[in-house]
Amino acid sequence: MKTDVVIVGCGVAGLYAALNLPREKQILIITKSDRKSSDSFLAQGGICVLRDEKDYESFFQDTLKAGHYENNRESVEIMIRSSRGIIEELMSWGVEFEQKDGELLYTREGAHSRNRILYHEDITGEEITGKLL
């Protein structure tokens, strides 16, 4: 078997990477157990997203604080700025987040100072990995 890319792990990061590689590539995803044992599948919480431009500075500061200011600032910027597009891409693949009257619902978790977490019931990880597979 010829393989162009080997991805170790079947969590969200590995699955998302596989889906963003060129279609002609032969991709092999390996895991030490099964998909239901991945940390991503077991994750109950949600996924943080930049709600609007007014949210940027507090999101940036919350992320730095949560990382004890050891974060790579450029990586934090990329994560925050790309979050909305990634959410839209996940939704285009069928991932469902909680909504009310057609509007996404946001909650607050961990180090976040405002509601910016999208979630699916209490099984966000299962929802995302299930749809990416």
Cite the ranges covered by each PLM segment.
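A short, basic/flexible loop-to-alpha-helix module at the beginning of a structural domain
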Residues: 1-2, 109
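Conserved N-terminal/central alpha/beta ligand/cofactor-binding core
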Residues: 35-133
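N-terminal Rossmann-like FAD-binding beta1-loop-alpha1 element of flavoenzymes
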Residues: 3-29
